């Protein structure tokens, strides 16, 4: 825990004071309901500014996971995204999106480093338009003070994710992410980091706080 706090406190102050930086507050949950099945839950509150007072998007996502084995998971789910224009006086979302998604996650290890490959296909209804999109994310988890990520571990979370459309503009966006995380318990961890999102020729940085809570509802008390 001390190492986690030291890294966060000594992060470059200039990085967190950029006027154009956004802020994402995130919750992720994988709730195991049987040996092979679990429920995914997710909430992301995204802001145009670093202060959480100018909402950009509210994303709600859920899904059903089937665990093929400990390193392979398939998911089918639904997501809703409410999009708000920067500094808009309107309280309701200007653009509403409903999406269905199919996903496959495959994990492998090289030494102490975990590599997580996530493949996702999305069917999107953006207001009255229908779109398809493919996403691939490669994420690395690197424990710093222990051989593996367990209770009390400080770790790095690093990923790159590319988004591709099936029509119109082929390239949709790319996200590059780096964070420091702390594993509080088997089910709970926190990551604090920065994401750089590139859309066409425009790019923006986002300060991120991500809480993960994965209770096992099958565990005997």
Identify the residue ranges that each predicted region occupies.
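Residue-level signature of outer-membrane beta-barrel architecture
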Residues: 31, 66, 78, 106-108, ...
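Transmembrane beta-strands of outer-membrane beta-barrel proteins
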Residues: 39-41, 74-76, 115-119, 136, ...
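Short loop/turn motifs that connect adjacent beta-strands in outer-membrane beta-barrel proteins
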Residues: 19, 33-36, 71, 109-114, ...
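Bacterial Sec-dependent N-terminal signal peptides
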Residues: 1-23
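Start-of-domain marker
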Residues: 18-77, 84
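Outer-membrane beta-barrel "beta-signal"
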Residues: 101-104, 140, 205-221
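Residues that define the transmembrane beta-barrel architecture of outer-membrane proteins
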Residues: 21-23, 56-58, 96-100, 130-136, ...
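Transmembrane beta-strands of outer-membrane beta-barrel pores
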Residues: 43-49, 78-84, 108-110, 121-125, ...
